[in-house]
Design a protein with these regions (language model features):
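Acidic-basic catalytic patches of nuclease active cores, encompassing PD-(D/E)XK
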Residues: 1-39
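Short solvent-exposed loop/turn micro-motifs enriched in small/polar/acidic residues
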Residues: 40-42, 87-91
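Short, surface-exposed beta-edge/turn micro-motifs
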Residues: 90-95, 102-105
Length: 150
């Protein structure tokens, strides 16, 4: 079933959400972050973590694009969902995109992503979505590329 662009898809959530969150949480724990546990899903920012007295807010998403680093990323820009901009109302957050096919991820901060100059309104027509959606296309050089082994 196709969903209107910009709307929540339960099937995509079920397939990707826990995978992405668990993968990032394990990575953060290895880096000595403390993860705030959620009692139940609140459909708010995915992860809240602390390190050295600082609070980090993190949104996790799976990207169907294959990459291992900036050089192998197949596009000049990285596309971030406009509907996640609401999380920046409470302040800066880190937006992580995971490559499910290997051990790589990229991230960028919301203050860089959600600038008007990167905003793009686009007609979407895929097997899963249709209609008008908002994206922010950030030059890949402004994103941080990593593997979970680093």
């Amino acid at each position: 079933m196709r969903t209107k662009a910009g709307k929540f898809r339960q099937d995509s959530y079920d397939e990707n959400d826990k995978f992405a969150i668990n993968k990032i949480q394990k990575y953060l724990l290895k880096k000595n972050f403390i993860i705030e546990e959620k009692d139940q899903e609140d459909f708010d920012i995915d992860i809240i973590a602390y390190k050295d007295g600082l609070k980090y807010r993190i949104e996790a998403e799976v990207k169907n694009t294959f990459f291992t680093d900036s050089g192998s990323y197949p596009f000049d820009t990285v596309s971030f969902l406009g509907r996640k901009k609401k999380y920046s109302n409470e302040g800066l957050f880190y937006y992580f995109l995971l490559c499910k096919k290997n051990n790589s991820f990229l991230y960028c901060t919301s203050d860089i992503i959600y600038q008007e100059k990167y905003k793009e309104i686009k007609e979407v027509n895929t097997v899963h979505r249709f209609g008008t959606d908002v994206f922010y296309r950030v030059p890949r050089q402004l994103c941080n590329f990593r593997t979970f082994n680093q």
